[in-house]
Amino acid sequence: LVIFIRHIDMVLRIHNLLVALFCAWAFGAAAHGGGQHGIPKTIAKQKFTENKGQWVNQIRFEAAMPNGKLLLENNAFYYFLYDANDISKIDHPGHTKDGAITVNGHAYKTTFQNANSLVNVNGRNSSTHYFNYFLGNDPKHWAGKVKQYEQVYYEGLYKGVDLSVYANEQVPLKYDFIVAPQAEVNQISMRIDGADALRLKNNALQIVTSVGTVTEQKPYAYQIIDGKKVEVNCEYVLNGNELTFAYPKSYNKNYALVIDPNVVFSTYTGATADNWGYTATYDNQGAMYVGGYVNAFPPNGSFYPTTLGAFQTIWGGGTGGNSGNGNGIAFACDMGISKFSSDGTQLVYSTYVGGTDNETPHSLVVDNAGNLIIYGVSYSADYPTSQNAYDKTVNGLGDIVVTKLTSDGAALLGSTFVGGSADDGINFDPGEFTAGKLKRNYGDQNRGEVNIDLADNIFVASCTKSSDYPVSIGALQSTFGGIQDGCMFKLNADCSQLIYSTFIGGSEDDACYSLDLGVNGTLYVAGGTMSTNFPTTTGALHSTYRGGLYDGFLAHINVDGTQLLQSSYIGTSGNDQIYFVKLDNLGDVYCVGQTTGQYPVFNAPYSNPNSGQFILKTNPALSTTVYSTVFGSGSGSPNISPTAFLVDTCQNVYVAGWGTNSGSFAGFANNMFNMPLTADAFKTTTDGTDFYFFVLSKNAQNILYGSYFGGNGAIEHVDGGTSRFDKRGVIYQAMCAGCGGNSFTPTTAGVWSPINQSNNCNLLGLKLEFNLAGVAVEIDASPRATGCVPLTVQFDGTVTNAVTYFWNFGDGNTSMQQNPLHTYTDTGTYTVMLVGIDPNSCNVSDTAYLEVEVRDDSLTANFLPDLVVDCDSNKVA
């Protein structure tokens, strides 16, 4: 599957909007989000993906076609097609796994008879972005920096005959034969195997299959003579299953001849593959990373058919029809990971990660070196792991997986399983679309979070149903509490060592959803519990169960995972859970959750009484409430499922989430009408299934921002996972949007894909800047911060919200410019300081530092000349 993306800036009153629409172009059909019909659109220009070992050797290039794939071999085209109606049955959000589904398919092959076996097949007009494939656990079949091309050219298919394969916006596939002067055109002969029937109608070839009819339009042939295009009368000749060309009026053999058929998949016009939105993050350069569920039908790595003609695949909810694992992933899928430039104009890479069964990404984070870390779940025994992985073997049903990719996404730096013999990392009652126990919002089964410390050690908060889940010696809870426990663990930077791991839970269902690092490597964890005996500590806010079906919890763990420093229930007599926890720069603890009770409003001037979302701030010891408040519509029930959370440097609190009243999410309705809005809201109305963004000022004094985001009828949502705000308060939000094949979700002009080019859901990336986090500065040096004396450096002060700038270059010189040019005339290492100032901002100023190294490139000979023979003959010996 191929994901195409683009973003653009739109400057509003207090925020910038970047929107990216992620379009998969292959197969699928009915909407994952509600069965609505899309607006008319042109066909996405086809691209051809090279084979660098990720597929079987005979495939040279692959292209996604409507409801299938086209495989290009040296001497053949292989068409692999599925029935659109069958695919639509499995790609629907309301479909519970109520049994296996039969998916009808058809494969046929066009062979160029007696063609040159040594033909040179190459791609032309390559993409700037690339794809990485980590499919299965055999590194021989991993491929990095796989390019796409607009054209595949067969040089010397026959003697004097070349073949060009390409596409345009009107037709999904075109191929031209280019016949050189004096070459024999009658060499061209194609044999079509596997079709139910072949027939000529009005000089067009109809290839009848069990899932529809493919039409190759009347061939168009021409020559360029004296600079003018001269059409040549050309016809198909069909003899059994052999296809050739005839020229009733002949042609001038002294000039090249081009034969140009058009292939029209008239039966396969509407259906494309699902790419559901799960998780997003950022790096220090503002690049955006998104992860999602990529519908892997046909199964990854196994789409090469062994027989031609009609076939059936039994779809049971897992790749290859594996429906017996009881997992909570209804449809076959791999992880799809993409990186985009900070302005959204470039797709940097897309990476596929998975094995022969199901995978989903739940949380992403970028480490201090710019490498991407993925936390997710895999049901594949052959999920890709690294050579020195902590655990290279799947342990039971679904396991937690942690995978680290290089900054270019082209190689694995580490990858491991973590789990026991039952399900790990999935918070669910069986059934993808069933509410129950702690799974109260659609997508709650895919919660959990990954984060890092300054040494790039990896921390994960999740859950497990495995009594034999691996725990470390001396863990704070070494035994399984029962049914489902929360769990947390720490890996080293390359995933080769499990530094610590522990259960946390009681006798009922428990789950960890979020974590943040405290002082000196301690860990704060938050989640939900149904256990009245969940471990708590004396002196914490609430050491006993608060009531209702479930409570939230906050826990503080020591640096080696051996001691519960503080732990507290959080909730009311109703139903409560905490979905995110964050610390401010003073170490105070903040959390956001849902409630059906009357969560107390304390020391908070701003609140929306009787609302279903609460924000709590406590001291680091979890013993004192600093403030607590509620926000929402005042309906008495939760309105949104939280997806991202932040406390910025000014102690403003940011919340992102989505709600739905749609029948597409039966049992998960969160009425999001009448949410608090501000005058500068991006959108002030909702169709009932949209995203919502909320910013609360320091000490809960007031609402700073409230807005909906979405299109009318677009059914925006996420299918689980975390998105993130960066430290400046910029949201990087993954969405599942355009469901039903529509383009109703707003995008901005010039984006990579301004419309949804599928007839299904696609992952949409939103980057929204609120400009509320006070002054923030960074330093960039161009062309570089090291060099030889004299060294001239162009400094770029990347500043948010500053009005005054002060530079100290470390050599006694200063500047008040925002982007000064400075020359160093002496060698040495200089510490450059930039201070950005705005007296009216919440934090007044911010400071950044950068080291500049200036060297001397002159050479001094460290030897003496040796006098040989006489004074007229100095030689260096």
PLM region spans:
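A sequence-level/structural motif corresponding to short, flexible coil/turn segments enriched
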Residues: 105-116, 170, 253-788, 801-806, ...
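Short beta-strand segments of immunoglobulin-like
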Residues: 781-787, 864-871
